[in-house]
Amino acid sequence: MDHEPTISRDQSRTARKGVGKGLGRDVLVASICGGVVALMVGASYAAVPFYNWFCRATGFNGTTQVATAAPATGPIARKIAVRFDSNVAPGLPWKFEPEQSEIEVNIGQVTTVFYTVTNQAARTTAGQAAYNVAPLTVGSYFQKINCFCFTEQTMAPGEKREMPVVFYVDPSIADDHENDGLSTITLSYTFYPVKDPVVKPLASGEGDKRKGNL
């Protein structure tokens, strides 16, 4: 007669301990992996504002600069053409375009231009504009005094708005031989959707955006 193999109590306890240790190791490994992934995601989010700050501070990658006033030296005789480009990222139902596609200005001349934005949705939507200039070597010389890109924009259903940009090209660009022969600068904006917009009350008289601009 054949006999089925039997397992002693000690062997059974040892087997259960082995299974328990295996499960414990799996849980530990899963926890470590989850922690590493969370750390990497957090680091990637932290890198975005740092990268934006670095670009604004240095003009890297064609990022323009922020100025508080007109240049002390005033405009110079050299002229340059400035083209205006507009884009809207997927997921934001806006129509966005410059009122002028190109203008000619003196270097150092403070100039105001307008972009027109229309919310084509039947709901309130919000967006934030990213920007750069081309060629990339001009980023540190393109100075903005006022720009809709500085803040998040919230639009009511069907709302149409004119958004100003006040800028100048720093006269010191004339001393940069890397930009000798430069005749045209392209200023480009892309509006991206904001999922959780900050609700701000509309100030009295804010409707006329052309008042009070340089």
Curated annotation (Swiss-Prot):
InterPro entries: CtaG/Cox11_dom_sf, Cyt_c_oxidase_assmbl_CtaG. HAMAP family: CtaG. It is found in: Cell inner membrane. This is Cytochrome c oxidase assembly protein CtaG. Residues 52-214 are periplasmic. GO terms for biological process: respiratory chain complex IV assembly. The keyword Membrane applies. The chain crosses the membrane at residues 27-51. Keywords: Cell inner membrane, Cell membrane, Copper, Membrane, Signal-anchor, Transmembrane, Transmembrane helix. The keyword Transmembrane helix applies. It comes from Bradyrhizobium diazoefficiens (strain JCM 10833 / BCRC 13528 / IAM 13628 / NBRC 14792 / USDA 110). Gene3D superfamilies: Ctag/Cox11 (2.60.370.10). The lineage of its organism: Bacteria, Pseudomonadati, Pseudomonadota, Alphaproteobacteria, Hyphomicrobiales. The gene is ctaG. Its main location: membrane.
